[in-house]
Amino acid sequence: MNKANSFNKEELIACGHGNLFGPNSPRLPVDNMLMIDRIITINDNGGEFGKGEIVAELDINPDLWFFGCHFISDPVMPGCLGLDAMWQLVGFYLGWEGAEGKGRALGVGEVKFTGQVLPGAKKVTYKLNIKRTIHRKLVMGIADAILEVDGRQIYSATDLKVGVFSDTSTF
């Protein structure tokens, strides 16, 4: 298992193909749905709750796929993509910890949007504070997160929940 403390884009894509933590580990999406370019830091003892943290980034440029369709003459990154990135990172964290199975977003306590990501922005930063992980019959991660654009916080989410399942056929 790869217990590195940072990951580049190629390694994140490898995770999407089951080649980073193993073929049975939770996978990131690939191509357009991968909303992360790099993980700057990941650990299991830092963060606000002392149970782990992740800091990751997405480079912004006007050619990103969503600016061309959301919305015509009013391009803005869909807020749901930033929220999905937070869930992606909770699932990645569980894989990094050694969980096996398929990751699924299970919910979120509260989400607030107080700004927007526009084509002229340079960088989105995701900061997650792990609140709890469960590694029993149920495998689940819970985290609080914020999203910053060019250093300014514009989204927050509490109690992001991701589960890892050996069988999703009845989910």
From Swiss-Prot:
What would you give as a GO molecular function for this chain, any one?
trans-2-decenoyl-acyl-carrier-protein isomerase activity
Does the keyword Disulfide bond feature in the UniProt annotation? no
Identify the main location: cytoplasm
Which reactions are catalysed by this chain?
Answer: a (3R)-hydroxyacyl-[ACP] = a (2E)-enoyl-[ACP] + H2O; (3R)-hydroxydecanoyl-[ACP] = (2E)-decenoyl-[ACP] + H2O; (2E)-decenoyl-[ACP] = (3Z)-decenoyl-[ACP]
Q: Which Gene3D superfamilies match?
A: Hotdog Thioesterase
Q: How does it assemble?
A: Homodimer.
**Main function:** Necessary for the introduction of cis unsaturation into fatty acids. Catalyzes the dehydration of (3R)-3-hydroxydecanoyl-ACP to E-(2)-decenoyl-ACP and then its isomerization to Z-(3)-decenoyl-ACP. Can catalyze the dehydratase reaction for beta-hydroxyacyl-ACPs with saturated chain lengths up to 16:0, being most active on intermediate chain length.
| Protein's UniProt name | 3-hydroxydecanoyl-[acyl-carrier-protein] dehydratase
**Taxonomic lineage of this organism?**
Bacteria, Pseudomonadati, Pseudomonadota, Gammaproteobacteria, Alteromonadales
Instruction: Point out the gene that encodes the protein.
Output: fabA
